[in-house]
């Protein structure tokens, strides 16, 4: 309410609108609606552990490091692909997930590495990143080499790592494109040169691999050993992970989120621009419009 105690404030109007829309949704709710097969094929998990947060935030190594932001980057990439994304703890079951991402999962032990290995052998697609597998549970760096425990997973070694100053830029080549980096670089050498997907192309780092992949059993492991500001390299590598696994993806721009729940597709627009939804002919819009306005919501069934 506003100060007169009668007139609805904007929040009150929004609340009233939501209540009316919920009534409309209840009228067409189908408790037997089946989970879309294309979403099941994209199901993605990101692994989180608060011990990693504390370990990474204490010695950040660079002023450009932010553990939460780094984790969020990979979540945003997955969501932009239209992938249903869950945050899991390391003890959770990974069986139902086609892709599992472990962003900067610094603290590991042999049991966790073996769990990842089993997941991949059974057909899972594991994505590891910089600062993964560097320390044991007590925060001690492994003597077997930088991130030594993950070497069997990635079939490669990491000889060193480095960061640039915030105003300096390095180059990485990947699939005939050149990308900028400056936050973090792992210098990787794969045991199989054909598994090296991206390479540093200038300065001291030139020639070393930045991204490698490895097939184990029915699945794959991809190690992204570089951190960029614009996320373009990580996004393109992640898209290849899904594509090689035969998983179709969307390409939603920043601020556009599309999810399915209880038989309803829901799209929201947190950007400043209109977004034209590409809906199937069978779609029936229940709330909103095909053109998704800023701060808008569209709900449909198909």
Give the label of every model feature segment.
Residues 1-73, 160-165, 169-182, 197-201, ...:
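Hydrophobic targeting/anchoring helices
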Residues 74-94:
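A short, well-structured beta->alpha microelement
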Residues 1, 79, 120-121:
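Anion (oxyanion) recognition and catalysis
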Residues 37-41, 94, 121, 215-216:
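Extracellular/periplasmic catalytic domains that process cell-envelope and extracellular macromolecules
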Residues 92-106:
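Active-site and adjacent substrate-binding regions of carbohydrate-active enzymes
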Residues 6-8, 86-87, 127-128:
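Short hydrophobic alpha-helical runs that function as membrane-insertion/retention elements
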Residues 81-85, 96-98, 122-126, 219:
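Loop/turn elements at helix/coil->beta-strand transitions in domains of secreted/extracellular proteins
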Residues 104-302:
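A conserved amphipathic helix/loop scaffold
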């Amino acid at each position: 309410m506003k100060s007169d105690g009668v007139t609805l404030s904007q929040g009150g109007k929004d609340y009233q609108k939501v209540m009316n829309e919920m009534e409309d949704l209840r009228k067409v709710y189908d408790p037997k609606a089946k989970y879309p097969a294309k979403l099941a094929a994209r199901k993605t998990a990101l692994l989180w552990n608060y011990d990693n947060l504390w370990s990474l935030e204490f010695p950040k190594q660079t002023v450009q490091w932010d553990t939460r932001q780094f984790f969020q980057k990979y979540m945003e990439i997955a969501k932009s692909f239209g992938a249903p994304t869950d945050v899991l703890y390391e003890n959770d079951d990974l069986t139902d997930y086609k892709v599992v991402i472990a962003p900067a999962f610094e603290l590991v032990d042999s049991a966790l590495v073996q769990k990842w290995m089993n997941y991949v052998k059974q057909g899972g697609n594991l994505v590891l990143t910089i600062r993964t597998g560097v320390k044991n549970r007590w925060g001690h760096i492994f003597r077997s080499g930088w991130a030594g425990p993950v070497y069997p997973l990635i079939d490669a070694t990491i000889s060193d790592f480095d960061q640039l100053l915030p105003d300096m830029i390095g180059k990485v080549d990947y699939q005939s494109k050149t990308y900028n980096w400056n936050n973090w670089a792992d210098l990787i050498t794969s045991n199989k040169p054909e598994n090296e997907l991206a390479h540093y192309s200038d300065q001291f780092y030139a020639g070393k691999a930045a991204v490698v992949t490895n097939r184990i059993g029915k699945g794959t492991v991809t190690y992204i050993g570089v951190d960029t500001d614009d996320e373009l390299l990580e996004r393109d590598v992640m898209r290849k992970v899904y594509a090689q696994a035969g998983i179709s993806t969307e390409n939603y721009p920043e601020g556009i989120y599309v999810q399915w729940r209880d038989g309803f597709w829901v799209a929201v627009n947190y950007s400043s621009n209109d977004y034209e939804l590409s809906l199937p002919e069978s779609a029936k819009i229940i709330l909103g419009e095909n053109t998704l306005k800023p701060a808008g919501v569209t709900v449909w069934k198909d």
